[in-house]
């Protein structure tokens, strides 16, 4: 259900959206990224053979991101034709940055636990603190204190750095923001609209 793709090429690809118009008809932007760059560090959830790909920019302390996450979870439960690529874009301070690094540590080391941790961090939202994050990790049979300190010890994270560059290149100004196939959707997408976009 989960596979990896290459974040380090995505910036270049999305900066050259216009050149993709000459690609094969079935090679839309998001699926082009997935199909050609499978070896890397971006969390992806859903059917690996899905025709619809959503690339989601988010921050764990963003209230609308949490609301959108519930919609995406519902979409994934309803459809096997959608996969979601999660791009950590921590713009709401240090605890957001730490949460993003923790999520990527989980993806790298315990990928089967990623979706549960991701959803748990989303539920913590704006009120998340060190203690609540550690508790969430412990509840999922992980060493919360160790992982939290590991994240704090990262002076920078290449994946997150690239996500920031990508967001800037796309002209994004806040979270959430989504790339669905060839189109960019800034802001929260109502479930009724989202469900139609991913049909």
Write out the residue ranges for each language-model feature:
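Cysteine-centric redox/oxidoreductase cores and disulfide-bonded domains
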Residues: 91-175, 179-199
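Extracytoplasmic thiol/disulfide redox context detector
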Residues: 2-8, 13-93, 149-174
């Amino acid at each position: 259900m989960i596979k990896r793709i290459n974040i380090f090429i995505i910036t270049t690809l999305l900066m050259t959206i216009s050149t993709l118009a000459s690609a094969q008809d079935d090679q839309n932007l998001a699926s082009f990224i997935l199909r050609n760059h499978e070896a890397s560090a971006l969390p992806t959830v859903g059917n690996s053979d899905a025709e619809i790909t959503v690339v989601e920019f988010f921050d764990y302390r963003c209230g609308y991101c949490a609301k959108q996450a519930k919609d995406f979870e519902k979409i994934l439960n309803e459809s096997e034709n959608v996969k979601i690529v999660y791009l950590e874009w921590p713009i709401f301070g240090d605890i957001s940055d730490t949460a993003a690094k923790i999520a990527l540590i989980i993806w790298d080391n315990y990928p089967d636990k990623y979706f549960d941790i991701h959803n748990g961090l989303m539920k913590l939202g704006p009120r998340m603190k060190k203690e609540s994050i550690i508790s969430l990790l412990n509840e999922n049979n992980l060493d919360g204190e160790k992982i939290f300190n590991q994240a704090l010890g990262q002076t920078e994270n290449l994946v997150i750095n690239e996500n920031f560059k990508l967001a800037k290149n796309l002209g994004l100004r806040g979270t959430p923001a989504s790339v669905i196939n060839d189109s960019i959707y800034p802001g929260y997408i109502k479930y009724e609209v989202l469900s139609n976009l991913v049909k």
